[in-house]
Amino acid sequence: MARYTQRPENALKRANEFIEVGKPLRALDTLQEVFRNKRWNYTYSETVIEPLMFKYLYLCVELKKSHIAKEGLFQYRNMFQLVNVNSLENVIRGYLKMAEEHTEAAQAQSSAAVAVLELDDLDNIATPESILMSAVCGEDAQDRSDRTILLPWVKFLWESYCQCLELLRVNTHCEALYHDIARMAFQFCLKYNRKSEFRRLCDKLRKHLEDICKSNNQTTGVSITKPETQQLCLDTRLYLLDSAIQMELWQEAYKAIEDIHGLMAMSKKTPVPKTMANYYQKLAMVFSKAGNQLFHAAALLKLFQLTRELKKNLTKEDLQRMAAHVLLATLSIPLPSAHPEFDRFIEADKSPLEKAQKLAVLLGLPQPPTRVSLIRDVVRLNVPNLVSDEFRNLYNWLEVDFNPLNLCKRIQSIVDTIESTEKENTLLTPYIQSLKDVTIMRLIRQISQVYESIEFKRLLELAPFCNIFELEKLLVESVRHNDMQIRIDHQRNSIFFGTDLTESQREYRPDGPALQSMPSEQIRSQLVNMSTVLTRAVSVVYPNRERDQRAKLRTQMVQHYHEIKDREHQRILQRQKIIEDRKEFIEKQNNARELEEARRHEDESRKAKQAEQKRLEQEQEKRERKRHENEIQAIKEKSLKEKVQQISQTAHGKKMLSKLDEEGIKKLDAEQIAMRESEELQRERKELQSKIKSQEKKIDYFERAKRLEEIPLFEKYLAEKNVKDKEFWESTEQTRIELDIAERKDAVAQQARLQRMYPDRDEYLNALKKERASLYVEKLKKFEIALAEERKKRLADRIVRRREERRQAYLRAKEEERFRKEEEIRHAREAEERAAAEARRLEREAEDEKRRQQYEKQRAKEEEAERKIQEDRDRLAREVAVEPSTCFSRRRQ
């Protein structure tokens, strides 16, 4: 028999009647029966179905039936996604608007409930109940109220957003609506601070984008190759990035940046400058929160370069502020380690180079930036000349000038200026600590080039914004990365630089201002300097050698060219022919590939149609399964009614049913109703037991009063009973004595009768003892024989064992005596060798002493001869000096 279905107009009218009498569940069931009909969506237009759909969604929102709303929305989409997209969009927007309004109303209700509780008693603001609740659950009244009132509606709104996104993700006609709902979901997460839902929403959107990229050939599917789709996805990811930054979910922000970069790389046209500026700004913020100052400065530099090139109306103040931001971010980058490859030993998944390369791709850089390259780019873009004088001086002091004694004082003045104008320079305040660390490292490097050692006290005077613990940590980090040779002497409270002249860990490449190399570096470069000097000397001694070699080489090259020119000419012609053939081959391959691509496209289209047909069949099967489930539900409802009718015939059943309304009964099944009946029966039993206990208490009081009245009567009864018991005991005792006397007489007679048996007993015992004694003597003889044999055997064994022990002791003593004699011989031989060595040493010393004395005598003789020669020279000099004067005087005469 066919199922009876109402027309949509009649169903809507009947649903309104159910709503008026306060039965929204019955109204929703009525509308749902219409949607389950297989023929309604092919018979009626959207003008008839749309009002019914709005009422259907209104009831779903009122009753928080998100799964039922999802079923109706999917049915409505299948009908009107190709016929009237505007109707589908209006229905979805209306559904979400109703859910948002109810959620906002629940939020206002929750706040109002808390306000009423707070204003209930002004004298007792903190009640004992509120104190206990806050101590137990750690929540205040607002949190508890939100969990009770607001949270169900928040959950319903979140499910509604997810259902709508899942509904529209593959429909190219509703693509704009899909992205609008995604932005609405981001606003929902921001408004209610739902971080977990935000992460799930990001994963869902990322999964949808991956599905679009994998399959884009469906009839109504979304194609990522269209520029409009790419722009919508890009705008949604930018909105996602802003929301993630506002919620401080930096991991999701980084994933959004990767998605944005992928979409921009996929797009054939260049993104607009405003989008790129927003991208670089958010990227710099994410890098800053991640503590990656190098890429943070690189992103700011890209933003500065883009703004300067494309924004023509940029004022001088804005340009100066941006330049100062870029310059300070670049100068605050920590000085690089000499061996960054050491970091790979503590990495868990990827090497630092791979991570840096991946981040460089996000910035559009061919290779990862470095501090030196960024400073070089800053100078190339003339950034130091665009900033104010104080920041220009900051650059010169850190990167150009060499003045370690005044470096920190100068930097401190810049830091004080930034801190004093913190309201104006809010962007520069986060760089103060990094700037101080870079300054201290610069100070240590410059001090190491001037001093070999310095005291901690003096170094702390030069670095006023650093304490001894921070300074020692920086020194240890410098040594750990092999940047410098530093030795800390805590006993002297001093620091020594470059004291190991035989060791240099790396080639010295000065980064920043430098005066001279370290002593260890000077020792290391001696061979290089020697090679340079020798090369120059050779060029001076043989100035024409290099010219002759070049002329000879040129002659050889010309001769070689004439030998191979014909062969090379033929090879070039052959290569041109190969290139032409290769072009023809590639063209044929391209044509074949295009044909194959067209054929593959047709196959994919056919498969897409088959998949769509299969999906429709699955939906049809799902509807049939849902209908079957509804029939089962109807059977359950029928059994429920029968159970309710059966229970209503009992007194406790009527009492239980009177506590439930019609809606509450519908929510229960037969088992739950039976359980409720059992609970009601148990409750009645407990009430009966309490009544019985109260009656028992009354009876107890009455019984106690009766006992008090019975006490005198019991005392009289006990006195009479004692007299009767005494008489009974006396008669019983007399009877017992008489019986004992008679029993003794019988025992004496029995003893006299048994004494006649004593001789027979003694005779039997003597015979038994003789028999046992002979047996004992026989066993004793056997034991003594066995004992004697065992004693002889053990004596023989002991003699053999002792003889062997004496033999082994003799052998050990003999061996020890031999070893002792060998040791004595060895010691004697060693003593003789030592004596001989001592004698040889004395002989060598005597010979050395003799040679020394001969050498001293020879040296004395030589000195005496030199002295005499010198005296002769002096005497001759004096004579030569006297003779001219004498000759001159004689000539004058």
From Swiss-Prot:
Which residue intervals define the domain PCI in the entry? Answer: 319-502
User: What ranges does the record give for the region Disordered, renumbered to this chain?
Assistant: 592-634, 837-893
The UniProt record lists the keyword Electron transport: no
Q: Provide GO CC annotations from the record.
A: eukaryotic 43S preinitiation complex; eukaryotic 48S preinitiation complex; eukaryotic translation initiation factor 3 complex; eukaryotic translation initiation factor 3 complex, eIF3e; eukaryotic translation initiation factor 3 complex, eIF3m; multi-eIF complex
* Keyword S-adenosyl-L-methionine (UniProt): no
Question: Which segments show compositional bias classed as Basic and acidic residues?
Answer: 837-881
Q: Write out the GO biological process terms.
A: formation of cytoplasmic translation initiation complex; regulation of translational initiation; translation reinitiation
InterPro entries per record: EIF3A (IPR027512), eIF3a_PCI_TPR-like (IPR054711), PCI_dom (IPR000717)
Task: Extract the coiled-coil ranges from the record.
Answer: 576-707, 784-881
- Pfam families (alphabetical): eIF3a_PCI_TPR-like (PF22591), PCI (PF01399)
User: From the UniProt record, which GO molecular function terms apply?
Assistant: mRNA binding; translation initiation factor activity
Q: Which domain of life is it from?
A: Eukaryota
Question: Where does this protein reside within or beyond the cell?
Answer: Cytoplasm
Q: Which UniProt keywords apply?
A: Coiled coil, Cytoplasm, Initiation factor, Protein biosynthesis, RNA-binding
- Protein family per UniProt: Belongs to the eIF-3 subunit A family.
Q: How does the annotation summarize its subunit structure?
A: Component of the eukaryotic translation initiation factor 3 (eIF-3) complex. The eIF-3 complex interacts with pix.
Biological role = RNA-binding component of the eukaryotic translation initiation factor 3 (eIF-3) complex, which is involved in protein synthesis of a specialized repertoire of mRNAs and, together with other initiation factors, stimulates binding of mRNA and methionyl-tRNAi to the 40S ribosome. The eIF-3 complex specifically targets and initiates translation of a subset of mRNAs involved in cell proliferation.
Q: What is this protein called?
A: Eukaryotic translation initiation factor 3 subunit A
